[in-house]
């Protein structure tokens, strides 16, 4: 009988101890969320200039690839196509890296550049997967619209 009382008492004490261990205390609050970073107008201006320069470089590379015409030679056509896929893929990563490196980029510009990077990735995969023209045309139209928006913001 004493054993049962001892085991019961230990179980009750253990339960209370475990409950107290997990009970939040007034001083045990989660830390407050960090405040959004603030940037000076100079930092924002420099970030915008750098991201716009990155966009111009990628846009130029993609335009060069699209303007090449090497006749009817199938090997030349495939070479140009592979170069275009690489320009889209590396361009999307370059733009994403530019945004990471420039946290002071204005939010509307950052959002547009992210969208363009996503469209470039989609186009690269669609071209490699030989997706139908209507799907590619839709992505190309989105690319044109977003590019025009970025160019207005960078002007």
Task: Label every PLM stretch briefly.
Residues 31-48:
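Short extracytoplasmic/periplasmic juxtamembrane "stem" segments immediately C-terminal to an N-terminal membrane anchor
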Residues 41, 74-81, 129-136:
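Alpha-helical rod/repeat scaffolding segments in eukaryotic adaptors/tethers
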Residues 46, 50, 58-103, 140-154:
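Alpha-helical segments in soluble extracytoplasmic regions
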Residues 54-72, 112-126:
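Solvent-exposed, amphipathic alpha-helical segments
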Residues 85, 89-90, 96-131:
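Long, amphipathic, charge-rich alpha-helical segments that form helical bundles/coiled-coils
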Residues 121-155:
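Extracellularly exposed regions in secreted/surface proteins, prominently low-complexity, repeat-rich
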């Amino acid at each position: 009988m004493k054993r049962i009382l001892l085991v019961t008492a230990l179980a009750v004490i253990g339960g209370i101890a475990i409950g107290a261990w997990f009970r939040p205390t007034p001083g045990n609050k989660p830390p407050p969320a960090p405040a959004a970073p603030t940037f000076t107008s100079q930092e924002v201006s420099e970030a915008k200039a750098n991201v716009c320069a990155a966009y111009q470089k990628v846009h130029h590379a993609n335009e060069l690839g699209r303007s090449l015409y090497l006749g009817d030679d199938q090997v030349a056509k495939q070479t140009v196509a592979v170069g275009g896929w690489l320009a889209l893929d590396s361009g999307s990563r370059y733009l994403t890296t530019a945004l990471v490196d420039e946290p002071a980029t204005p939010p509307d510009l950052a959002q547009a550049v992210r969208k363009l990077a996503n469209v470039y990735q989609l186009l690269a995969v669609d071209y490699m997967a030989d997706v139908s023209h209507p799907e590619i045309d839709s992505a190309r139209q989105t690319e044109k619209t977003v590019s025009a928006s970025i160019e207005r913001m960078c002007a």
